[in-house]
Amino acid sequence: MATNAKPVYKRILLKLSGEALQGAEGFGIDASILDRMAQEIKELVELGIQVGVVIGGGNLFRGAGLAKAGMNRVVGDHMGMLATVMNGLAMRDALHRAYVNARLMSAFPLNGVCDNYSWAEAISLLRNNRVVIFSAGTGNPFFTTDSAACLRGIEIEAEVVLKATKVDGVYSADPMKDPTATLYDQLSYQEVLEKELKVMDLAAFTLARDHKLPIRVFNMNKPGALRRVVMGEKEGTLITE
């Protein structure tokens, strides 16, 4: 790669799943993975990219799962939102230890723990090269953190949502179950809907489509993949118009 190569994005929204943080543990937060992700985000900041982050909470709690067991769905989702705040606190701490300025915002007030979400404040922080972590989802039950990622991405005028997963991109079928599944380089929003490909839930996906927000799905477990994505190299699957 030429040394004078420049990033293809100025501002991104990085969506991390809670499961990505748990590593091989199966639950909770793997400190080594957290630190590696913080280092990869630091690389982006050093390239001059403005970074917003949304983290899921599935490594700690899943509201939908307990709803099936009889818990009120609203209560379960509130607990799931708090799980994303816990992950956000861990990520902010990891970024601070990596000497990266980061701010944690919550969709609902948690005074003394983190800041309330403010669109204007978030934009100002991003312009000053601060990483902004958006937690507590959208602040409403029944909406996933993928919906939160697309919503915040649109609000902060990110050029792309980078969805970090455990696989190399979007496949024609589940690569864990079907060895013949093929990896797509690029898809249109329409193709994703027609082929019924699982990229993110429909509410999140249609929000991105309606606002022409591109989505790139890539494997966060592959070292250097995030950097390759922002440098415009062949990595993952791009979904656009």
Swiss-Prot record:
Q: Is Kinase given among the entry's keywords?
A: yes
Which Gene Ontology cellular-component terms appear in the entry?
A: cytosol
Identify the stretch(es) annotated as Involved in allosteric activation by GTP. Answer: 23-28
InterPro entries noted in UniProt: AceGlu_kinase-like_sf, Asp/Glu/Uridylate_kinase, Uridylate_kinase, Uridylate_kinase_bac
**Keywords, ordered alphabetically:** Allosteric enzyme, ATP-binding, Cytoplasm, Kinase, Nucleotide-binding, Pyrimidine biosynthesis, Transferase
State the Gene Ontology terms under molecular function: ATP binding; UMP kinase activity
Primary enzyme class: transferase
Pathway involvement of the protein, from the record: Pyrimidine metabolism; CTP biosynthesis via de novo pathway; UDP from UMP (UMPK route): step 1/1
Family, per the entry? Belongs to the UMP kinase family.
Please state what the protein is called: Uridylate kinase
Q: Which gene encodes it?
A: pyrH
